[in-house]
């Protein structure tokens, strides 16, 4: 197409023929494409961090296959009474569901549940766990999550711990509950909150941490993305996007909680701790999490820990959507048997966990680490590519309506190449976004699809290469026009459209390089 365009332009009567023949044009465009791809590859490598997770070479070894808690008493089942109570908080109240076992001799232990990110109301949260505990003779309280101070962008785990301590105090005050045997059960995000509660309130009798991230949310997110992508089978080049996406500041601000470190609070925990993971949970650092909890509580002089791994269970110790019966048995037995069950052997038992890499601190992007700047750059460039041609057409339309003679037309070959450059640049950005969304859906569904994962990435890269080819063709045409003495554009609007489009497309190509479209193994 390139050589044909130039040949056609040379045949237009009255025009000076641009220097160079068809073969030279092809050579220059091909050479420009190669050079452009290499330059973009180098820029992409230099602009941000690489993703080189550190392999875990010293895995945690289970001491027994059975997760059963030795010495755990067998109690119940007891009939259960349910009531809804209100928990007064600072500035508001939340409802909570209390389950109380009936017919138990003496006061019973109690458990307050702390929500993760995926739950919020007691009707849907911890139903199986609370009922199993209550039927075994343990009072339970599941509060609604306070939502007026909890958003996607803003949440404060220390303040949330203070709210949950109100639920703890309420359960301890109920008739029939032993105030010295009330503990907390926290799952997922809640495992960043429960250690704060335990550190600040030593009257908490025990702590259960289920599917605990342990590391800060930013590290856990990068680890989870890496695990999901490996399970999905994406090309190695895609992994470069992990630190650049997870490490940047999120557009619009907020998300300070992403760097909250729970370790200082875990190092003040003196309560017995039950740590539980499902070995099919790809989102959590199964080995690292348990090891860090053991090390952290040891700093407080606490050696009362129990770690359990459940075969085939995913996040929340669920198998096919239901909480593992073995986990419910172990949970109720461990709570009922305290303090004796707090340090019984085996300390670490169940399915052997596997963790390929450490959930380490995420490298920070050097150039495009500000999400607001990145979004502004992409949207601004796309806007220019779309609006600048419209501006030129508007000027031509106004001239026509006024009966004015239109300005001399621009070079048609250059116009076609600019249109191709604009279309391929924007098209590659759209294709990349589509690919990342499609891969995310596959990853979250634990699915594989070679056509999307491998074929989609190949398609994105080929489209990106077509954009570089179009850019090279534009540069070659500009050079030929300049050498032949012809104007590159006509009028102020023409120059604005030409150079504005070139600058916008160049910005898009650099952004694509940043996200790995032009990687060459460097």
Residue map of PLM features:
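Alpha/beta-hydrolase active-site loop
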Residues: 154-175
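Conserved alpha/beta-hydrolase
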Residues: 130-150
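Alpha/beta-hydrolase-fold serine-hydrolase catalytic core, especially in secreted/extracellular enzymes
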Residues: 3-10, 27, 302, 312-314, ...
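The serine-hydrolase catalytic nucleophile loop
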Residues: 119-130, 145, 287
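Short beta-strand element of the alpha/beta-hydrolase
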Residues: 106-116
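Primarily recognizes the serine-hydrolase "nucleophile elbow" in alpha/beta-hydrolase
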Residues: 170-230
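N-terminal cap/lid segment of alpha/beta-hydrolase-fold proteins
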Residues: 51, 58-106
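Short beta-strand/loop motif that positions the catalytic acidic residue
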Residues: 269, 275-277, 281
């Amino acid at each position: 197409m390139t050589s044909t365009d130039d040949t056609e332009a040379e045949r237009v009567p009255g025009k000076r023929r641009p220097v160079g023949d068809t073969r030279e044009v092809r050579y220059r465009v091909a050479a420009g494409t190669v050079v452009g791809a290499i330059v973009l590859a180098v820029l992409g490598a230099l602009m941000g961090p690489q993703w080189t997770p550190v392999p875990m070479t010293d895995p945690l070894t289970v001491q027994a296959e059975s997760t059963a808690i030795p010495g755990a008493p067998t109690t119940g089942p007891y009939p259960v009474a349910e009531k809804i109570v209100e928990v007064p908080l600072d500035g508001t109240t939340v409802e909570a569901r209390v389950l109380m076992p009936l017919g138990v001799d003496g006061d019973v232990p109690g458990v307050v549940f702390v929500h993760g990110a995926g739950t919020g109301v007691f009707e849907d949260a911890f139903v199986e766990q609370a009922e199993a505990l209550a039927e075994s003779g343990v009072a339970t309280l599941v509060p609604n999550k306070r939502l007026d101070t909890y958003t996607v962008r803003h949440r404060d785990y220390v303040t949330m711990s203070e709210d949950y301590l109100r639920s703890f105090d309420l359960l301890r005050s109920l008739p029939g509950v032993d105030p010295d045997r009330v503990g907390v059960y926290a799952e997922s995000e809640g495992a960043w909150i429960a250690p704060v509660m335990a550190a600040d309130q030593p009257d908490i009798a025990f702590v259960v941490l289920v599917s605990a991230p342990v590391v800060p949310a930013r590290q856990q997110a990068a680890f989870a993305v890496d695990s999901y992508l490996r399970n999905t089978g994406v090309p190695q080049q895609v992994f470069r996007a992990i630190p650049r996406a997870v490490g940047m500041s999120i557009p619009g601000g907020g998300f300070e909680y992403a760097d909250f470190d729970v370790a200082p609070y875990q190092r003040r925990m003196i309560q017995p701790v039950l740590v539980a993971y499902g070995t099919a949970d790809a989102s959590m650092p199964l080995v690292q999490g348990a090891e860090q909890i053991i090390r952290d509580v040891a700093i407080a002089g606490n050696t009362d820990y129990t770690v359990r791994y459940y075969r085939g269970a995913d996040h929340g110790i669920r198998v096919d959507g239901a909480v593992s019966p073995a986990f419910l048995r172990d949970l109720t037995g461990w709570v009922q048997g305290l303090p004796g069950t707090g340090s019984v052997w085996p300390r670490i038992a169940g399915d052997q966990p596997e963790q390929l890499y450490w959930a380490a601190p995420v490298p920070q992007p050097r150039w495009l680490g500000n999400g607001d700047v990145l979004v502004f750059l992409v949207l601004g460039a796309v806007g220019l590519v779309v609006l600048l041609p419209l501006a030129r057409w508007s000027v031509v339309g106004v001239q026509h309506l006024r009966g004015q003679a239109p300005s001399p037309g621009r070079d048609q070959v250059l116009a076609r190449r600019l249109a191709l450059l604009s279309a391929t640049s924007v098209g590659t950005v759209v294709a990349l976004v589509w690919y990342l969304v499609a891969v995310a859906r596959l990853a979250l569904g634990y699915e594989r699809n070679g056509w999307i994962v491998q074929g989609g990435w190949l398609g994105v890269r080929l489209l990106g290469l077509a954009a570089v080819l179009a850019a090279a063709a534009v540069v070659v045409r500009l050079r030929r026009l300049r050498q032949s003495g012809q104007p590159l554009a006509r009028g102020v609007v023409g120059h604005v459209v030409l150079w504005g489009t070139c600058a916008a497309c160049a910005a898009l190509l650099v952004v694509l390089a940043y996200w790995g479209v032009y990687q060459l193994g460097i």
